[in-house]
Amino acid sequence: MFFDDCWNPTYTSGKQPEPKAGTHNSGWVRDPGDLLFTSDNLFPTLEAYVKDILESFKNDKRIILWDLYNEPGNSGYKNKSLPLLKSVFKWARQVNPSQPLSVGVWNKDLSDLNKIQLENSDIITYHNYSDEIQHQKAIDSLKTLKRPMICTEYMARRNNSL
């Protein structure tokens, strides 16, 4: 995974803080986070980063799928994540790795992002923390795309998704 719109907004290069015992994802940070919206020249650096990793491992049999971007639009970013989402798919397609590409859908209300994710993913991946009935509805909806499908995040006891 190259990019992530989840969790902590503050990050720095170098050694990271120690994990906090008993705190879920205490050290997880967004990447590139708000820097994406405040730095005018970040895209060339991100493109070089993505292409370098993909070129290095594009035929590596240990990799079964490239999940390019975790939860685009999270942390209130919404459609501000569209340019990076479109770009990461474009950069990956230019490298043409042997493995399939995907970005998991996770919020049905982010229709513009979901459209790009579903149109460009070779394998449909999705996150679902709902109960069994709602999860089945999501599966039934995604099955209409007639592509392989993987649930890549699941289960929240508070949502009865056991």
PLM ranges: what are they?
Residues 1-123, 127-134, 144-145, 158-161:
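Active-site mouth of glycoside hydrolases
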Residues 149-156:
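Short acidic/histidine-rich active-site segments
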